[in-house]
Amino acid sequence: MLRALKGHVESPLIVVTRAASTNAEKLEEIRERLAKGPNFQDFVQNPDYSKSEWENYEGKLRREKGEEQRLRLPPWLKTTIPMGKNYAKIKNQLRELKLSTVCEEARCPNIGECWGGGEHGTQTATIMLMGDTCTRGCRFCSVKTARKPPPLDENEPVNTATAIASWGLDYIVLTSVDRDDLPDGGSKHIAKTVKEIKARNSNIFVECLVPDFRGDLGCVETIANCGLDVYAHNIETVEKLTPYVRDRRAHYRQTLKVLSEAKRFNPNLITKSSIMLGLGETDEEVENTLKDLREAGVDCITLGQYMQPTNKHLKVIEYVTPEKFKHWEDRGNQLGFLYTASGPLVRSSYKAGEFFITSILENRKKRQALNSKPEQ
């Protein structure tokens, strides 16, 4: 899903979605809403489509077996062209710093909202660690692959933490390529980055979207106990489709095991996963996947539309309607997820989700502080 530009090996691969509001009153309003415990949907309402616009859509939404022709993009997946002062500022800063942005290369549908500021002016960033080359080749992902990618940059943890500290962010997401060529899968490198970030700013919330480390529980424990706040690992699709969608080394049950063990190693963690829809899955299979994730103790789930990155990747089987995504949002809430983000343009590191999780973590800290106070 992510890929970086060539030629900047020494720099961390950074996707900045810094959208700082210039309106003090607006920021104060957001803080007040967080303090009162907002609903996640307060942050993810998409004004670009309404039921009246998609309900009467007569275009084809599903490819039949054997059909080669690609489906046309329905109206609810069409987004506005990125623009605005914040967008231009972010883009220029990245160029000046010679930092690579996977937002652009992956053609993320939310780039205009994130870089342009969005409705709430949230300040988040996503950083991709350990290079731009993955040892795996999932059929939905456009990251380049190799059996033995270049060695890790040993300065990356410090450089990344220093950059983050200077930005004054509230929430950071660390993601990475798979590095099966390394004995520990890069787990110590990721853990060191988290520790360096926390050493500079203990108040920043850190989410790690990590690989499965081949199911090595020692690596999972390293990440779970490194000081992060959110442990994320994506299941991607339903069990039946996993061998066709993900790399052969990725296993459905292994993903569930990683998520459940992360919670066992550190019960205070928030755990998170993501499902792509539109690959040919049935409603029953999605339902079972949601139940499996809840049984594994997963707290947060995101569901979004699969989008074919290039002609070489898996074709979209179906464009799922906003109504169906709303159904899965309701179902996730019924099953007891801490939050369910479900929508055509929702992605696993959707910034509004980060904003909402921040409020959850802040409330947890407040409760822990109150509970730790000695009785008078």
Swiss-Prot record:
Pathway: Protein modification; protein lipoylation via endogenous pathway; protein N(6)-(lipoyl)lysine from octanoyl-[acyl-carrier-protein]: step 2/2. This is Lipoyl synthase, mitochondrial. It comes from Drosophila ananassae. One of its GO terms (molecular function) is metal ion binding. Its cofactor is [4Fe-4S] cluster. [4Fe-4S] cluster 2 binds at residues 134, 138, 141. The gene is Las. Binds 2 [4Fe-4S] clusters per subunit. One cluster is coordinated with 3 cysteines and an exchangeable S-adenosyl-L-methionine. Keywords: 4Fe-4S, Iron, Iron-sulfur, Metal-binding, Mitochondrion, S-adenosyl-L-methionine, Transferase.
